[in-house]
Amino acid sequence: MAKKGKKFQDAAKQVEALKAYAPKEALELVKKIDFAKFDATVETVYKLNVDTKQADQQLRGAVVLPNGTGKEQTVIVFAKGAKAEAAKAAGADVVGDDDLVQRIQDGWLDFDVAIATPDMMGQVGRLGRVLGPKNLMPNPKTGTVTMDVEKAVADSKSGKVTYRTDRDGNVHVPIGKVSFDVDQLLGNLQTINDTIVRLRPASVKGAYVQNVSVASTFGPGVKVDFSQF
């Protein structure tokens, strides 16, 4: 494992490794010890007691953070006719059908969210090898395959984030920027916690949430006492 730099080590010294901090205290500490020269993203990681080989124990979806993400999202929409016009009116950055599919096949990927109406998925499906690995493929589970393109665009522009368990049962979700007030970060973290707890698979035995931490982009993780939510 690569040796961490001095700034990281200095930041890590301010974190009690074995302590689980109250949620607000943990976020205050993340802001305090951040050393990035830009407005770093704050992320939470949930370690869950799930078997991701079991389909019913895989979490995937999307949620709108009450205080946004602090990032301007570039949103594209695959749609035709009236739905294309509705997407444009809702603020989508790029709207198209076969022409947009071809543009992406030609290598254009300068966007953060892709939305599609169901009737476009036959064409959009051809982009699976390109969009899938980047988690950009429209999916009904994340609300990005829908006839309600107005809501999908509005949600994406106002702080919608997606989540999914990785192979080890971890869920990584951005909850804002270091520049956010602590209460803004806390509100977003509470929303993520409520969502994950609500989605506990019925087949999970024993403790469901095993560990929660928060960190800035380059900063050390701070363990959260999730019993205090």
From Swiss-Prot:
Entry GO terms, CC: large ribosomal subunit
Pfam families assigned: Ribosomal_L1
Superkingdom to which the source organism belongs: Bacteria
CDD domains according to UniProt: Ribosomal_L1
Alphabetized UniProt keyword annotations: Repressor, Ribonucleoprotein, Ribosomal protein, RNA-binding, rRNA-binding, Translation regulation, tRNA-binding
GO molecular function, one term: tRNA binding
Keyword Ribonucleoprotein on entry: yes
Gene3D superfamilies xrefs: 3.30.190.20, 3.40.50.790
Biological processes annotated in GO: regulation of translation; translation
Family: Belongs to the universal ribosomal protein uL1 family.
SUBUNIT field: Part of the 50S ribosomal subunit.
Biological role: Binds directly to 23S rRNA. The L1 stalk is quite mobile in the ribosome, and is involved in E site tRNA release. Protein L1 is also a translational repressor protein, it controls the translation of the L11 operon by binding to its mRNA.
Protein name (database record): Large ribosomal subunit protein uL1
Organism: Pediococcus pentosaceus (strain ATCC 25745 / CCUG 21536 / LMG 10740 / 183-1w)
Name of the encoding gene: rplA
